[in-house]
Structure formats: C-alpha cells, structure tokens
Amino acid sequence: MHKRLLLLGGVAVTVLMIAASATARPAAISTARASDATPAAAPFAQSWASVPHAAAARQAKSILVFGMEQDITGFNTALTCCGAYWAAVTGNVPVVRGAYNIDDKLRHVLDLVASAKATKTTLTYTIRPDASWYWGGKKTPVTYKDFAYTWQQLVDPRNDVASRSGYDQITGFTHKGAKQIVFTWKEPYADWPDLFGLVYPSQALAGQDFNKIWANCVCGNDGEPISDGPFYVSNYTKGQGLTLKVNPFWYGKKPSLKEVDFKIITDTNTEVQAMRGGEVDAINPTFGVNLAQLKGINGITFNQVPGLYQEHIDIQFGPKGQPLLRAPWMRQAIMMGIDRAAIIKTVYGSLAGNTSPLNNIVYYPADAAYKSDFGKWNFNPAKSLALLKKHCTGGPSAVSQSNSDTWTCAGYPAKFRYTWTASNATRTTQEAIIKQQLKSIGIEITDAALPANVVFGPTGVPSGNYDLANFAWVTLPDPAGFVPTWSCGGLNNYLNYCNRKATALMNASQTELDPAKRARLFQQADALMANDVPTIPMYARPNPLIWKSTVLGMKNNPSQVGFTWNVEDWKWKS
C-alpha cells in the first residue's frame, strides 16, 4: 500500500468510506473469470453458501474464514476517499504488491523488486524477473511501465490522492530494459523505502479514470481480476464480504490455503461471539475490554502487540466546525477536561497492560525520539475550569458531575458535536465518559454516532464536517506519513489546521537524510503543535490478532500493512 496514514474509525480497525460513483461497477459484482466453475464466480452471497459451517470441514477444503469488522467502498487506497484499513488488508496487501513489504518486526523486506537503491540524485528499482500479473487468467509481466504509471498517477493534479509526499520529489525516469527503472530526484526523499508500496498495473488500467478505478473490484479495464500477489479478489458484495483465491502466477511461496473468505460482521460484540462459536477462524478486532472473554479459551490463540495506531480526537478548525474550537484556550480546556488514563482503564480493563496516554502526534512511546509534549495538558479539570472562567460566562463555579450549566464564550455556547462510528462498543463507552467529564466543567457534548460510510464519506470527516471526531490513524514505522496530516494544506489535513513553523520543520525533514537531525526536526514540530492542541492524542492502541489454534502461520503486524502481510504462510494444522 502507499505510504500514507490510513483512517481507522468505526466498528473496528477500519476505514475511510465513500459511496461508489454512478459510473462505478455495481455493488454486488463478480470479478472472477467466466471459466471458473466454482460458486465464487458469483457474488459473495453465493460463494459464502458453499463455505462449510464447521471449521473441520473448512479445514478439509483448505478454506479459511476471517471476520471483517468493516465494509469498504473502494480498493484504491491511494485516494483521499478510500484510505481504508480493511480495503488495504483485503484488496491491496495480499493482491497488489509493492517494492517492499514490511514484516512483523517492522523491517522492510524486498518484495516486487530484486534490488532497490537510492542516491542523492536517483532512485533505482530492478524488478524481479519472475514478477507477473494475473489478469483474468492471463499472465503478463510486471515492467518498468507499471512503476512509471504509478508515479504519474500519484502526481497528476487531477487525481484526488491523499499524499504525494516523496513522489513529488521525482522529476522523471529512464529505464534499462523492461525490468529496471531509474527515477531522478529533485531532492532526495528520506523515507524512500516506503514509496511504491503498491504498484498499479499500467496495461490493465489503460484508459481508466484513476479516481474511479477499483470501486468494487481489483480488476482491469475489462472487469477481470488483476493481481501480482499470492491471491486475487474473486468477488466482493457490499455489506456481505469478499473472497480471495490463489493466484497461480504468484512469484513467491505458493499459498497452502485455496481460499480466504472475509465475512463482514460490523458489530464488535457479535464478532467476538462469532469467534467463540466457530463461525469465523480469525479476527483482527478493535481492541477493547470485550476481548477479555477470548483469552484463555482452549483452542484460541490470542495475540496482542503494541500497535502503530494513534487513537485521537480531531478538532475542526475550518468553517464547518464550531467557531470556539479555533481558540487555543478552548482546545486546551477540552484536553485538560478529559481523563485519558481513566478512559484507558475503563475501555481496556485487564487488557490495558502498560498502555498510557499518548503525548506526541508524530512518534509513539516506543520510539527513542518520543517526547511527552502534550503532557502539559494532562487531566486537570480545575485548571480547565479556570481557563473557561477567564474567557466565558454562565458556567459552573466548581467542577461537579451534577453540573447542568454550559459556558457561553464570545456569544457561542460551549457545545460541540462529537462524532464517532456507530456499533463500536469501545468508542461508544469512550464517548460516554468524555461527555460526562466535560459536562462537569460546563462543556456540552452532543452525540453524533453515525455509520462509517457517513462519518468517513464525502460529507463527513474528509469534508471537515465535524467539531470533534474520534477515530485512529494506523501508520508505518516512519513518521513521514504524518506530514500531509498536520502540515498546512496537507492532503490528509481534514481538520484544516495550520502552523507554518511546524509545517516548515516537517517539510525540511522530508529531505534530511541524517536520522538524528531528522528526528530533531520532527521533535521541534511536535513541540509547536502541542502548544496549539490541534488534536487530542488519546493512546497508542494495542493491536490484537485472534485465531483458531489449528491455524498456523499467522503473525501479527502492528503497522498499516496489517495481518495479511504473510497470508501465503497461513495453513491449517495437518
């Protein structure tokens, strides 16, 4: 996938959702070859009808069922509309490969290319000689044209991509034969290993509008499935799920499984019960206290690792947000009014471990460069109340859970919409706690729990239509992915925040090749942004992966590459 942040909201580790355009393919669609004689040649409902209900029967057929917490409405995760975690882990990572893969130890491993080399002036990729596309049963080679096409689409101003970072430093290319491409830099790009994380098939997409491709399939311009990974998307049906089938032309290790079915289960509690009851063989759920019931169950493996998941509450600065949020003292008051440590204890319970409030928005606690810049705004309701008294009227005289008074500030009531995705038990609990905590200091929260396709659709978070929005970013190890999120005019900057000094520092980091100097630039930027409080970092969310103990080969990956990074290794225990 591309080096960008992926949105995680809603009922799970998920998703930036947008409805398919009028010109997109129908929602229920088969992208398998007509010659496929299996039920998977039809939409998912028919495919699912042939999947055995008993795990032992699935094992006999080498079929695995994975619980999928969120639907998707597009597989082109490079677009602003479609930065969906579940789209990436189902339709990108196991299907369309990139220069590097990232393993469970967060190491970059050569994947589509045999070698990659960056200098101050060039970036050279030598493509694996055996790398080929599966296109509706036909075999076509992966060539330099695919890398060139990918770069051209990502820098084309007509395309609504979420990030051009790094790609916009490339000025042109040459090639040596079909399997080597040499890009030239305008300036070197520090995080170059995360470029070309997904390479598009140029021949299969010829003549297509990049903004509209892959709305309901991962396919070529003829609707036939396309893949250079271990699997291809055989079918997808909105609201139901999708099926992956083995790509016979995959250059890597031959998968042991013949089929992986992703069954959409949008309620987190229902998902847990599906795992307990054997309806699904594995889940990658939203981390929450409800998962405790799966620990210690015979026959279930429960794996939990520190994740690169930034759980946060975005604050809207733009015209669609409440005007009071543009005042730094209000944002500071809100953050000091939220007891993040208490929330962690409540929503995670015995699973919390050493999870603590996150006080940085470019680094995670395990990073050596992490500094507790936002710690100055830790829970302090008395100080928060004093700030509100200084700027507002009509609020409470003391902090009290029974308070019913709301401040009025500069003619506006201290009343804000709080948006999160419905059906998520963890975030619903989180919102209820925050609502009560802020009520005790005279700030009123109105509930805006909505379906994911509304929250992350064209009129939701990407449009800036919220006051406070609770979701998460899932990232790669390098902080470069945060640059288009926090910088002025950044393509991922849905909150419309701008600190020009912080932006200049982050932009400078993009071409600084010395790791220590680069870290200092990010540290300085974070310190400046901490003064502004553009967002409220909550915590670095742990990442769980839970599967039947009779399934072998699953390894949790804490980054946005996700759990399908090694799907070809999955197999049933013999």
Which positions does each model-derived feature cover?
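Surface-exposed binding/hinge segments that line
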Residues: A57-Q59, K117, T122, T126, ...
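Short, low-complexity disordered leader/linker segments with a strong preference
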Residues: M1-A60, G172, S397-T408, S574
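Detector for C-terminal structural segments
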Residues: S35, A45-W48, T90, T237-G241, ...
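N-terminal lobe/hinge region of extracytoplasmic solute-binding protein
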Residues: Q46-W48, L64-K120, R128, Y149-Q152, ...
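Aromatic- and charge-enriched surface segment that lines or borders ligand/interaction sites
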Residues: A114-D160, V182, E271-A274, L324-L325, ...
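Alpha-helical secondary-structure segments
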Residues: V65, V142-T150, A178-T184, P188, ...
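Gly/Pro-rich hinge or "lid" segments in bacterial periplasmic/extracellular proteins
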Residues: I102, G197-P255, E259, P381-A386, ...
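Ligand-site clamp/hinge motif
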Residues: A131, D222, N247-Q293, L308, ...
